[in-house]
Amino acid sequence: MTPSTGPALGGVLSALEALGPAPASDWPGTPLPGNDFLTRFDEDLALLADLGVSAVRLGLDWARLQPAPGRVDDDWREWYANVLLSAQRHGIDVWLALHEHTVPAWFDDEGSFADGKATGLLWPRWVELAAELFGDRVSGWFPIVDPVGTAARWAHDPRKHEDALVNLAVA
């Protein structure tokens, strides 16, 4: 897909805020409800288009799409594909965010972004999977939305914090 040319009025559709944290994510506790984008995305995208929005950043929820290593959740793959088709129908360019706030619990168990080996091995697989699933339907990518905020979870451990910042910069 080719992005539109010229200025754009854009918006953000955050996976965490729209859907709530995934049960398979690193966010502990009871999943919080989202804002109903799950079932009303077509209406929401139509409204955005009517308001003149021509581009959005849409967060991919890694923990929803890949709740276990090597396993893709087909229901979530289909849901994201439908959102992308809806955006295209409404003339909205989509830029996918590969990481916004949360990661799968299994990636967190491996050390998450504070572990160079886990990041170097598992992050590229996620990037390749996302590109394979959705690459032909998007205008561009945001690899890491907030690397400094992501690394802040290790602020209590200066070594891990530094490692996370480096690994996030490389990712």
Give the positions of each predicted feature.
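Active-site region of glycoside hydrolase catalytic domains
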Residues: 1-19, 81-85, 89-171
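Glycine-rich anion/phosphate-binding loops
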Residues: 31-42, 70-82, 114-129
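Aromatic-lined substrate-binding rim segments of carbohydrate-active enzymes
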Residues: 45-102, 168
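A short, mixed-charge helix-start or loop-turn motif at secondary-structure junctions
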Residues: 26-30, 65-66, 112, 158
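N-terminal carbohydrate-binding accessory modules
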Residues: 1-53
